[in-house]
Swiss-Prot record:
This protein's GO CC annotations: cytoplasm
InterPro entries: Chaperonin_GroES, Chaperonin_GroES_sf, GroES-like_sf
Sorted UniProt keywords: Chaperone, Cytoplasm
SMART domains given in the database record: Cpn10 (SM00883)
Subcellular localization(s) per the UniProt record: Cytoplasm
Gene3D superfamilies, A to Z: GroES chaperonin (2.30.33.40)
Biological process per Gene Ontology, one example term: chaperone cofactor-dependent protein refolding
Known role: Together with the chaperonin GroEL, plays an essential role in assisting protein folding. The GroEL-GroES system forms a nano-cage that allows encapsulation of the non-native substrate proteins and provides a physical environment optimized to promote and accelerate protein folding. GroES binds to the apical surface of the GroEL ring, thereby capping the opening of the GroEL channel.
Pfam families for the chain: Cpn10
A GO term for molecular function: protein folding chaperone
Record protein name field: Co-chaperonin GroES
């Protein structure tokens, strides 16, 4: 993938959550909410505080979805990232 976010933007790949509950109930894709966390794949030159490979949590309605290499990513403004999961 050749994508470089500009300015204070970050490219994030959503982390998929489990599709089965603890009791074994399978949750269909259309009933699941989109995850609010993901892995940073690329960082713009002015985006500070996150690095490629880190797991981050972001605001619910943040970002713009883009399709690259048959995968869906989010381009987020650095201000929409709420924190880093360590």
């Amino acid at each position: 993938m050749n994508f470089q976010p500009l300015g204070k933007r970050v490219l994030v790949e959503r982390v998929e959550e489990t599709k089965t509950t603890a009791s074994g109930i399978i949750i269909p894709d259309n009933a699941k909410e989109k995850p609010l966390s993901g892995e940073v794949k690329a960082v713009g030159a002015e985006a500070e505080g996150v690095k490629v490979g880190e797991k981050v949590v972001f605001a619910k309605y943040a970002g713009t979805e883009v399709n690259l290499d048959d995968k869906t990513y989010l381009v987020l403004n650095i201000d929409d990232i709420l924190g880093v999961i360590k």
